[in-house]
Amino acid sequence: MTAAVSPARLVLARARTHRPLLAAALLTVLLTTAILATLTAYSTTIGDASLRHALAHPGDPADTTLTLKAEVPADRRAAADTAVREGARAAFDGLPVTLRTLTRSGPYALPGALRPPDRRARGDEPDLTHLAALDPTQIRVTAGRLPARTAGPEIEAALPERAARALGLAPGDRLTLTDRLDGPPAHLRVTGVYRPADPAAPYWRLDELGGRGIVELHFTTYGPLLADPAVFTGDRISTGPSGWLATADFSTVTTDRTDALREAARRGAAALPKADALGGTATATTELPAVLDRVERSLLVSRSTLLIITLQLTLLAGCALLLVARLLSTERAGETRLLLARGASRAQVARLAALEALLLAVPAAACAPLLAGPLTRLLAGQGALARIGLRLDASVASVAGQGTVWLVSAGVALGCALAVTVPALTSSFTAGRAGPLPGAV
């Protein structure tokens, strides 16, 4: 190798000479790198999508929520709301949080005249009820209208559909409730009838009647009677427990955030009841850590399956690449011996082989992450994933923005370059002078 000929020009000249083999090698390297980059992107993307789907559609919708109940006086409810909102945001590791509340009164006795003949309480025990301020998004008015704020002693209220039917009450009726805690009676006027928008919604976990309208235990309890939130700010009715339901927006959660989210949920559920604004009477519950554990185990199984497929493809691609590399080195053996005969050192030959390998590796490393997005979408559009409607964020920008995909592409491309380089080096370094003839010439 003379100084007059630069290594780059020599590499290009050799490439033109062996175009078919180099094209086969380039195609093999590109396919290997693109497929492994796609499997990496697919594993990450399907993991993130599966996690979000599992959190958004759990077996029990209440499992991914944070529920808190506490006895809070009327003058401390605003501070309690702030404390719960901040605590819920911390419990969900900073994710956007939606907070719904249920504020209720103490227990009241219904007038004896309203007892249905088939639902009479034993002895002199009255049927019970209570008032509550409910989240308006969780109810549907079926008759009349929602209660409004009133200035006088009379309180407007709406009854659950089932309770109104059992008690024989309708919009326009009036009744007086007796406070079971020796407080003043509550004078009500029925303005409407409602039912839960979704009786299975987690929100109704805050209601001791579970949104059913009637519960028969030792007492028969009807309710809750829906009242305007302003009713609970004064002393017109007795004070009962308050409930909060916090739900998070999991649309941006990724699998690398699972551990932090699990730990935050555990800490948050333990820390919230100790907040000063809640008076030390609160209880907080969430099943989010258990849900994350189940999802993580499922993801480990799916990733193990992908790992097996990846190893099989790697072995197949490696064999094909070594075969092409051996053919290429065989074709170039004469050129390599000629370079050595003209005074080129083994280091120069090795550098030349490395430059030739980089011609294959660099395009593959650059193109594989860009091809991974469309290939991932192609995989996701087939089979069970397409049938269940699992949506993957597999755009070119999203996949190309994953550092892991670029690292895998670079690593695989360099590995392929090494696989192409080694046969050329070993064949040239082991080639030497022919052995002596067996006899005299």
Where are the regions a protein language model picked out?
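Selective transmembrane-helix segments that form parts of the transport pathway or gating/packing helices
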Residues: 353-370, 406-413
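Short, glycine/acidic-rich beta->alpha junctions
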Residues: 167-169, 321, 330-333, 341, ...
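Hydrophobic alpha-helical membrane-associated segments
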Residues: 31-38, 313-324, 363, 367, ...
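Membrane-entry segments of alpha-helical transmembrane domains in multi-pass membrane proteins
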Residues: 298-325, 351-352, 356, 401-408
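Feature of multi-pass inner-membrane transport and sensor proteins
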Residues: 1-24, 45-50, 54-60, 330-348, ...
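Conserved G/P- and acidic residue-centered "switch" motifs that form tight phosphate/ATP-binding loops
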Residues: 172, 343, 368
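Membrane transport/envelope proteins' first extracytoplasmic loop
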Residues: 1-317, 382
